[in-house]
Amino acid sequence: MQLNSTEISDLIKQRIEQFNVVSEARNEGTIVAVSDGIIRIHGLADVMQGEMIELPGNRFAIALNLERDSVGAVVMGPYANLAEGDKVKTTGRILEVPVGRGLLGRVVNTLGEPIDGKGPLEHDGFSPVEVIAPGVIERKSVDQPVQTGYKAVDSMIPIGRGQRELIIGDRQIGKTALAIDAIINQKDTGIKCVYVAVGQKASTIANVVRKLDEHGALANTIVVVATASEAAALQYLAPYSGCSMGEYFRDRGEDSLIVYDDLSKQAVAYRQISLLLKRPPGREAYPGDVFYLHSRLLERASRVNAEYVEKFTKGEVKGQTGSLTALPIIETQAGDVSAFVPTNVISITDGQIFLETDLFNSGLRPAVNPGISVSRVGGAAQTKIIKKLSGGIRSALAQYRELAAFSQFASDLDDATRAQLEHGERVTELMKQKQYAPMSVANQAVSIFSAEKGYLKSVELNKIGDFEASLLSFMNSEHADLMKTINDTGDYNADIEGELKAGLDKFVETQTW
């Protein structure tokens, strides 16, 4: 059979049209070294900083070092089964974690996988762990309070929505307790909470989760866990994962609170990764970009304006601002706040709550040192009644500490100095508060009012706690309407002052403690 040229060309065209090839563009490389959770890869020509690299066995690594002829990557999890010669490939995406309301009440790992045995997660999508913080124009000034429930904090070191307030102190001094109580106090405020546990024992985290559940706060909280036994990469990334989960609420016009417990351990994990990647060490062997490690994380905590929220939600949410408030925790060694990481985080944040070992050991809990604790922006957000009443608390405590040190050497004190010392002693005693017992605004206002207006003068020092408990019980039963008004509005005027005074006068005349 002979074919003419036309038939041949038609046949070729037909075959070309019918030709079907499935092509997959992949950038493959080969592992040339594996050690201590770090892999070195040759042959990856097109890879991004922070990109996920797919490993054999459906595992992933993150590219951190991009060198001329190799890529240094850190493995997300166990690496014992990896070997030289294994093939890897790029994915073209950076690490993302699930976000949404379905995560509330759940315990997840750094990758957003559930580890609480409650079944699969319900989520609203995925968000990258590394996100650029909102710009200056997209932000709104801080003017709404976050009540921690602690008299010492809410009166002297107030925290606003969108603020970054550092909790700093030595180990076993009540840093986590303060943060957990702040979370418990948000269960009825509408503020969604994220608790990020980095480098802690699994038993410690289990206890925290149990306490949150007991006090009804777990349903309002996402717990992100990277235990001490997990890979350094997971400990380093856990705060960023938790931040993305908190930003979900901020960007939709809601308020959220995130606790990083603690950033010292995150910095140690990052130092470990950097040294294994052969990056040049700096002060205290930390890499040069350890400041950027924390600044890019903490800058994401912000209060954003209504225009930002409307633009993000494509017009679904209008006229609402959103906020992400951060409470980072830093552990110091023997009270040394001038070490590298503490000074970095102090300079990044909007204030710090300094917890002191000597105060803790003397029985003052929370062990807040009011002299060097400060809130740089929270004053504008403080509840009106607490702001008006607490003006003299900080100065009374500061004067008391100075005079107490002086009075140890002075045998005879004048009446004014003795009165200041006695007032300071009573205020110090009043600032004590039990764990898992956050106080409402009205209860705080009544306690501070009793100190400021001199009702504690006739109370023995060891009876201050009993006096306060009886007073609050009396006010909540006999003056319930007044307490509700204070809690609802936070206002302070002549009428409220008169009612408070009448209530305390009646209590002192008729009640015992």
Swiss-Prot record:
Annotated membrane topology: Peripheral membrane protein
UniProt: ATP binding residues: G169, D170, R171, Q172, I173, G174, K175, T176
Keyword Nucleotide-binding: yes
Catalytic activity: ATP + H2O + 4 H(+)(in) = ADP + phosphate + 5 H(+)(out)
InterPro entries: ATP_synth_asu-like_sf (IPR023366), ATP_synth_asu_C (IPR000793), ATP_synth_asu_C_sf (IPR038376), ATP_synth_F1_a_nt-bd_dom (IPR033732), ATP_synth_F1_asu (IPR005294), ATPase_a/bsu_AS (IPR020003), ATPase_F1/V1/A1_a/bsu_N (IPR004100), ATPase_F1/V1/A1_a/bsu_N_sf (IPR036121)
Class in the EC hierarchy, top level: translocase
Site keyed Required for activity: positions: S373
Record carries keyword Phosphoprotein: no
Record-linked Gene3D superfamilies: 2.40.30.20, ATP synthase alpha/beta chain, C-terminal domain (1.20.150.20), P-loop containing nucleotide triphosphate hydrolases (3.40.50.300)
Family: Belongs to the ATPase alpha/beta chains family.
Assembly with partners or alone: F-type ATPases have 2 components, CF(1) - the catalytic core - and CF(0) - the membrane proton channel. CF(1) has five subunits: alpha(3), beta(3), gamma(1), delta(1), epsilon(1). CF(0) has three main subunits: a(1), b(2) and c(9-12). The alpha and beta chains form an alternating ring which encloses part of the gamma chain. CF(1) is attached to CF(0) by a central stalk formed by the gamma and epsilon chains, while a peripheral stalk is formed by the delta and b chains.
Function recorded in the entry: Produces ATP from ADP in the presence of a proton gradient across the membrane. The alpha chain is a regulatory subunit.
NCBIfam families: atpA (TIGR00962), PRK13343.1 (NF009884)
The name this protein goes by in its record: ATP synthase subunit alpha
